[in-house]
């Protein structure tokens, strides 16, 4: 039966679509100089990414649906954890040529990592149905916890300058394309990451957001 509209719209991809939408809202917030709300949207997008794979695995999917899931997840991740953080730091900084170069390189490294991951993931799924046990390099989603942490550090210490954000992006970008093997977090690890994210989000809302009112 011929499709009336391109794409897939079952529950297995809803969290991915929602994560991208939240990230785009975060980009708009960063452009509008609403930095703490931009970070909250980034973290919400990261929350969606944490669970979208588990949700997708609950449904028996055909080959096309699986391949679409791989592609759409990476495209969403590029916007959420590549473009949004780059725009955030650029808008927060002095917006000079060098900051723009670092932002561009950061997005490029995220793009290369995600494209390379897609190739590896399609090859892996062609020979096994088991879940991935580890990652090569730093997952792009890590920025959803690292960037708010640096922002909160600057806010609490009242330090001047934004060099820390530039250094963070350079280190994270290098991590994206590194070949260091990082074990995929299990249940306890995910709970710890979730709790860290919740604490960061609460700090952003109560100490930064309400403090600005």
Feature map (PLM): residue ranges:
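Lipid-exposed faces of alpha-helical membrane segments in multi-pass integral membrane proteins
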Residues: 15-21, 41-44, 79-82, 102-108, ...
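Topogenic membrane-insertion module of multi-pass membrane proteins
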Residues: 1-53, 175-213
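Transmembrane alpha-helical segments that form the membrane-embedded catalytic/substrate-channel core
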Residues: 49, 106-120, 170-185
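C-terminal membrane-associated helical module and adjoining short loops/tails
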Residues: 125-213
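Multi-pass membrane catalytic core of lipid/isoprenoid biosynthesis enzymes
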Residues: 12-17, 58-113
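Cytosolic, membrane-interface loops and tails of multi-pass inner-membrane proteins
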Residues: 1-3, 51-66, 116-134
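Helix-coil boundary and interhelical linker segments in multi-pass alpha-helical membrane proteins
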Residues: 25-40, 79, 83-104, 146-164, ...
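Membrane-water interface of alpha-helical transmembrane segments
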Residues: 2, 6-16, 32, 36, ...
């Amino acid at each position: 039966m011929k499709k009336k509209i391109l794409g897939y719209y079952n529950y297995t991809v809803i969290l991915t679509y929602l994560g991208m939408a939240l990230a785009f809202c975060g980009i708009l917030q960063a452009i509008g100089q609403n930095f703490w709300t931009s970070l909250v949207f980034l973290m919400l997008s990261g929350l969606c990414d944490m669970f979208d794979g588990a949700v997708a695995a609950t449904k028996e999917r055909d080959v096309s649906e699986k391949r679409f899931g791989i592609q759409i997840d990476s495209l969403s991740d590029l916007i959420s954890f590549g473009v949004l953080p780059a725009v955030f730091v650029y808008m927060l900084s002095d917006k000079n040529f060098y900051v723009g170069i670092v932002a561009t390189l950061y997005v490029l490294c995220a793009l290369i990592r995600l494209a390379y991951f897609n190739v590896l993931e399609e090859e892996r799924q062609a020979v096994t149905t088991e879940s991935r046990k580890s990652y090569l390099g730093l997952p792009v989603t890590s920025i959803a916890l690292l960037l708010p942490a640096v922002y909160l550090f600057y806010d609490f210490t009242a330090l001047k300058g934004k060099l820390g954000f530039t250094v963070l992006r350079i280190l994270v970008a290098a991590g994206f394309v590194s070949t260091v093997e990082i074990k995929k977090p299990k249940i306890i690890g995910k709970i710890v990451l979730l709790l860290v994210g919740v604490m960061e989000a609460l700090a952003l809302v109560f100490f930064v957001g309400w403090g600005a009112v």
